[in-house]
Amino acid sequence: MKEQTTMPNKLPKLEGCSYTDNLSTVKRQISSAASAARRSPAEISLVAVSKTFQADRIKPILASGHLFFGENRVQEAVEKWNPLKLLFPDVRLHLIGSLQSNKVSEAMALFDVIETLDRPKLAQAIARERDRTKQCPNLLIQVNTGEEPQKGGVLPDRIDDFIERCQTEFDLTVRGLMCIPPLGEEPSLHFGLLREVGRRHDVERLVVTSGVSSVRSFNS
């Protein structure tokens, strides 16, 4: 199972700095953290969370060469990114918000990665759309490692069965696992749980996140 870290950030504008300046600052921080961890910065990708940002505020970041972006809502993303992708066809979009079954067709046409697969009904809808279009984005299963009722994701005691159903009943390739550890708890415990699950099911990528201002892992 491979791990590659990315650090999503909503790129709040720092005092006296542009968004591109802020992006450069975050990338320098990532490079320093990678060196401290004896990892190559090339293994790390930054997913800029662009939800609620208008296209004119995203274009300078795209023009700077950044290609990885995360969105929460399908309809907002479709309206924003369909025109932008004509100008920047190499951009890679991650759906990081909950996906409703009736939005699957639009989501699969737009996103390169869906990070929030978490229930059989959604898996079935994705499989049907995959069969119809013969295409499928990378799929990540969200695991609710903290068993928090306000968060989406599969509970730990159900994750093995859900992965098996995705792989056998729906013939879906699970590319990774994602979790959002509870605030105030040691994240490594939750990341360790994902690693164990991933090894049991030969999932090749591990995705871990502490939200838009902290750490996310993804191997794109």
Question: Predicted segment positions?
Answer:
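C-terminal accessory segment of soluble enzyme catalytic cores
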Residues: 219-220
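Conserved alpha/beta-domain cores
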Residues: 2-216
